[in-house]
């Protein structure tokens, strides 16, 4: 069986190591991989967030099964593209991946289901967000809505930290497409 793992981090290294142990694995490719992964698997220069590119690569390399490691390709719909092309894939659809890729969507789902979750508010205006933070006080959690490579959640112990976090999110240090929610 020819297997492709999408990603290049520690999670994908662990997956590659484990999959390589299976005698059914004839060829293991990791894209893009990294130097550590290259010691145990073939690495390929491939954009893991481009569904059409991944599908074409799988067809050209007779890939039987794909494991999507990182959240970004899932949010980009790569698993949907693979399934649409009839390629077996381990990873949720883009719609299901929204639970990971959008904090506000997850909060909305929790609220609709009656699942306990911290109080929250979503803002698209910096002044309104700052007014809310001032009214709530600290400590408070400020989150960017979306994938932010681990930099989207700020636990602000002081009001100044919370206001600085909002400036960072709205000011573009964190991707502009993210809008904060405040827990």
Give names to the regions the model predicted:
Residues 1-94:
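ATP-binding N-terminal substructure of ATP-dependent carboxylate-amine bond-forming enzymes
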Residues 7, 123, 154-158:
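Short beta-strand-to-turn element immediately C-terminal to the catalytic PLP-Schiff-base lysine
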Residues 21-24, 59, 84-87, 111-115, ...:
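Generic secondary-structure signature for well-ordered alpha-helical cores
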Residues 44-48, 83-86, 107-109, 137, ...:
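Short, hinge-like loop/turn segments at secondary-structure boundaries
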Residues 47-50, 102, 125-126, 158:
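Acidic/polar helix N-cap motif
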Residues 65, 116-118, 135, 139-141, ...:
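Conserved ATP-binding module of the ATP-grasp superfamily
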Residues 92-152:
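A conserved helix-loop-beta module that forms one wall/lid of the active-site cleft
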